A protein has these predicted regions:
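Non-catalytic alpha/beta scaffold blocks inside enzyme catalytic domains
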Residues: 1-29, 33-39, 46-262
Length: 263
């Protein structure tokens, strides 16, 4: 505490702990008490978790924002309608009128969106299908409720290099007195690992690093963008998904950056 300013740096172990919020608050309070906030070399700083999780967050998977942290206001949608080259009214037609500008369900509360009655959830119907893409609920609480919710779904899709805890939980026998939805479909789609594809990764400091492929994808696994493109093709907007990929083909630091290849 005598060497000031000093910083506290933590990773996912603290953030995703069952009392992670309290632990993060305690770190910030400690730094405030020591006078280390607002100074170069000080602060309470978090390192992101899995490979390229910062880049994944930047493109907008969070339920309360469009890509680039634009939020969900009408102006944000109009901005991205221009960026994507689609009509704003067409985008509106993809959503229920009262849902478009509301924050979605967080990853820790999806259980409630499945199990609660409609009047307790801020949406028209309960969640019927769920994708776990590169994510597993190992660090989340309410394991029994999570199992009940998985049993109630109509569709569960797990996209991961390995059968994750999500896939294992879906295959577990139901608790006594609980039944599995007889119409439920569960799919495990094998995604390639970070070593089996090339591309950019964004670090916690927002620096971008090019990553070369080490080996070809093993067995039936394919890179995430190939899986995403396959879904887009089947849903009828495959060309829209990849039409702007050419924007990534440029020269930087004397090197030609390759355009992603969609098969």
């Amino acid at each position: 505490a005598k060497n000031r300013p000093s910083t506290i740096v933590w990773c996912m172990g603290q953030t995703q702990h069952t009392i992670g919020n309290s632990m993060v608050r305690a770190s910030c309070i400690l730094q405030l008490a020591l006078g280390n906030i607002g100074k170069s070399g000080g602060g309470a700083n978090i390192f992101r978790g899995h490979d390229n999780v910062q880049g994944a967050t930047d493109v907008g998977p969070n339920p309360d924002s469009l890509p680039g942290y634009y939020g969900l206001a009408a102006g944000s949608w109009k901005h991205y309608a221009t960026v994507w080259g689609v009509d704003y009214e067409w985008i509106k037609g993809r959503y229920a009128p009262d849902m478009m500008e509301k924050s979605g369900t967080t990853v820790s509360r999806w259980v409630d969106a499945v199990l609660e009655k409609n009047d307790m959830v801020d949406q028209q119907t309960d969640v019927k299908g769920l994708f776990f893409w590169g994510h597993a609920p190992n660090s989340q609480t309410r394991g029994l409720d999570m199992k009940r919710a998985m049993d109630k779904l109509d569709l569960l899709v797990v996209v991961d290099p390995y059968p994750s805890a999500t896939a294992a939980m879906a295959a577990m026998p139901s608790a006594e007195g609980q039944t599995v939805n007889k119409n439920r479909n569960v799919y495990l789609l094998p995604a390639a690992t970070q070593f089996e594809t090339c591309g950019t990764a964004t670090a916690s400091n927002r620096s971008i690093q090019w990553r070369e492929k080490v080996i070809d994808p093993l067995f039936e696994s394919v890179p995430d963008h190939v899986i995403m493109q396959a879904f887009a093709d089947r849903l009828g907007f495959g060309e829209e998904l990849s039409k702007n990929y050419k924007m990534l083909n440029s020269t930087f630091a004397g090197k030609q950056w390759r355009e992603p290849q969609i098969e």
